[in-house]
């Protein structure tokens, strides 16, 4: 009763109305210094809450990834839409290093001195380790040169590669027209090279880039975190900065590897 009288004397009838009992503070609230660091890392690296959690652990800061997600949502640093994920019931068979390596080509968005360049990408499905190189064309010779360099530089033996149905990778749709014997179509130079090296060459189904999911996802990472944030004025500068970016990628923790980096996954 004394609180009602005090409120009535102070605010009149307005003081007797019901008010929110929500607490004005919380004993376990995240410190403002940690919140500012989370926001800073999000704007700088544009990573998800789980990867930000690992980055903070490297700095000696322990915060649950759900707490980080709530902070990002409160600050408006998350996307405004949700994607519905379809969960299929299947048995995931772990792959060995080099068992399947996905290879694809990405157009460099920015022309240099009026010329178009192309990024060849190879990524190991088991460890997510990858290798990049820039070419001034994406023909058969570039594909073969890239595969030869990949074999020499990869820290594992490549048993099979997987590509799309581009003319720089296969003759699946053009070999019959170029061959005098339709029942024995001419093989693509890359297929002949794979036979010489003892490498199996898999092809994805037409119109199914999802079957090359690892390399397609890495290309999205390149677009969002390298090409959209990096400026280069010459071919040499592009190659240098791309090499640094790929080194950072191979030393970045991945959710698909349970927090390991591709270089760490190679040791297991």
What positions do the PLM features span?
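Mobile-element integrase/transposase regions
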Residues: 62, 66, 73, 77-123, ...
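C-terminal domain-tail junction helix/linker
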Residues: 197-199, 220-268
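RNase H-like two-metal-ion nuclease catalytic core shared by retroviral integrases
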Residues: 163-165, 177-224, 243, 265-266
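Mobile genetic element proteins and their domesticated derivatives, centered on retroelements
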Residues: 1-4, 12, 37-38, 52, ...
């Amino acid at each position: 009763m004394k609180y009602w009288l005090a409120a009535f004397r102070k605010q009149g009838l307005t003081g007797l109305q019901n008010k929110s009992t929500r607490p004005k503070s919380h004993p376990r609230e995240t410190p403002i210094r940690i919140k500012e660091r989370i926001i800073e890392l999000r704007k700088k690296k544009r990573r998800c809450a789980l990867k930000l959690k690992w980055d903070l652990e490297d700095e000696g800061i322990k915060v649950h990834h759900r707490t980080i997600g709530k902070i990002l949502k409160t600050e408006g640093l998350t996307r405004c839409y949700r994607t519905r994920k379809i969960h299929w019931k299947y048995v995931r068979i772990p792959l060995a290093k080099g068992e399947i390596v996905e290879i694809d080509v990405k157009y460099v968005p920015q022309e240099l001195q009026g010329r178009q360049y192309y990024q060849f990408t190879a990524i190991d499905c088991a460890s997510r380790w990858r290798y990049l190189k820039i070419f001034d064309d994406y023909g058969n010779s570039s594909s073969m040169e890239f595969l030869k360099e990949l074999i020499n530089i990869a820290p594992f033996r490549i048993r099979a590669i997987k590509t799309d149905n581009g003319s720089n990778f296969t003759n699946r749709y053009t070999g019959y027209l170029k061959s005098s014997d339709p029942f024995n179509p001419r093989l693509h130079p890359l297929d002949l090279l794979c036979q010489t090296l003892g490498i199996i060459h898999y092809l994805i189904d037409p119109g199914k880039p999802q079957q090359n999911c690892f390399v397609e996802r890495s290309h999205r990472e390149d677009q969002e975190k390298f090409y959209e944030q990096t400026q280069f004025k010459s071919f040499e500068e592009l190659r240098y900065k791309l090499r640094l970016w790929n080194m950072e990628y191979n030393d970045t923790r991945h959710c698909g590897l349970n927090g390991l980096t591709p270089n760490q996954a190679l040791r297991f």
